[in-house]
């Protein structure tokens, strides 16, 4: 998940930090400005009021490269519609680790419609919605259950959702996320 926020940047740079640790710290901080500084060994220091934390991160070069959305096919939908489609299919996805190919929701962009399908071998959920996209953008992909649940959690009820896909990567872009 990549999210943009307003910040006063003194010196540009990149690093990575464990998201669970960072979010649990930020969640408990008072509603005030947070100052983040990172040293050469990727140790981040967070200052907020009287609170002070250090988080050991990794170099950004060790993080997997996510290509930019511009070189991918783009599908545009309403966030609420996409979220509802996910909710109506996610329940049927398998949780059996030995059947990993069923541990998600199939997204099929074909014939001017988006079809979502999930099954655990006993239950089957299918939902379709018309979507405009060029014929060369037709594709299918399995969205892992964990990603499905995260999208259901963060998507809003309204607003535009842009889905970029190419080969084995998919990017969901909405608002500042």
Label each region the model flagged.
Residues 1-177:
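Structural preference for solvent-exposed beta-strand-turn elements
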């Amino acid at each position: 998940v990549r999210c943009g926020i307003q910040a006063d940047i003194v010196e540009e740079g990149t690093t990575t930090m464990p998201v669970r640790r960072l979010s649990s710290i930020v969640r408990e901080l008072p509603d005030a400005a947070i100052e983040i500084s990172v040293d050469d060994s990727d140790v981040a220091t967070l200052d907020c009021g009287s609170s002070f934390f250090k988080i050991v991160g990794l170099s950004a070069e060790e993080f997997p490269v996510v290509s930019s959305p511009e070189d991918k096919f783009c599908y545009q939908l309403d966030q609420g519609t996409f979220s509802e489609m996910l909710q109506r299919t996610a329940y049927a996805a398998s949780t059996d680790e030995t059947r990993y190919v069923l541990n998600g929701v199939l997204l099929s962009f074909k014939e001017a419609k988006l079809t979502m399908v999930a099954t655990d071998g006993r239950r089957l959920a299918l939902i379709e919605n018309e979507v405009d996209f060029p014929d060369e953008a037709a594709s299918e992909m399995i969205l892992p259950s964990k990603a499905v649940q995260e999208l259901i959690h963060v998507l809003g009820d309204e607003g535009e959702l842009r889905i970029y896909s190419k080969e084995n990567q998919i990017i969901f872009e909405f608002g500042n996320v």
